Amino acid sequence: MSTDPASETAATAAAGPGPAAEPAAGPGRVAVIVPAAGKGERLGPGAPKALRELGGFPLLVHAVRTLAAARSVDLVVVAAPPDPQGLAEVQRLVADLPGDTRVVAGGASRQESVALALAALPEDCAVVLVHDAARALTPVDVIEAVVAAVRGGAGAVIPVLPVADTIKAVDGDLVTATVDRSTLRAVQTPQGFTRGVLTKAHAASDPAAPATDDAGLVEALGLPVRTVPGHAEAFKITTPFDLVLAEAVLRRRR
């Protein structure tokens, strides 16, 4: 599916002054890490977020199927809940999916899960994407654009959308300022990296002060992070209302 007109307006921001970009990824394979060990309390009690059903299949299954459909992706590694039951359930779900999909035990946090999956990748994987299972409807075009940007020489790449709402800074219940949204972008996944950049970023990270995404770890090193246009359908399914929206998108696709 091609990107919608709104996503075409997302700026591809050039990095400002700073350290030179890391070397290009080289000819190695492309792997995607899917951290799927989180509980996802905002969706309410029940199964882990990645295992919540959408249209009769878990979010994780939708996400892995889409990744497998991307021609540039060679391998998907799912970081599953570390308990035996959760690990076995994820292994069962992905066993018959297309493509090369492997499962490793995740950690106590998203950051730890990504680090564990990264350490388990085969040595010939030169490009590594990290993708939220909860962004189960991300179009293949977004995945391909991220990979192409890394292959083209970027050390870190994120898909983004312009911010549509007016943004206010507040102190308690008082507005203190209206934020200029012209330079703001909403960040999506998959986020793409050369393996060296992502490995270096996780090695330097502080588990006591986790970043909200992997690009944040790269930023902390002072390395540039590039952008490509995201897509409205790559939204994160986090709340019950998001599930309603996702069901509507699925019905339209069918």
Predicted regions and their residues:
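Short phosphate-binding loop-to-helix
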Residues: L93-V127
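Acidic helix N-cap motif at the loop->helix transition within catalytic regions
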Residues: Q85-R92
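Residue-level signal for inorganic ion chemistry
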Residues: V34, L60, A117, H131-D132, ...
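Hydrophobic helical membrane-anchoring modules
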Residues: S2-D4, E8-A10, G16, I237-R254
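Conserved core of the sugar-phosphate nucleotidyltransferase
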Residues: T138-R226
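N-terminal glycine-rich phosphate-binding loop and ensuing alpha1 helix
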Residues: S2-A10, E22-Q85
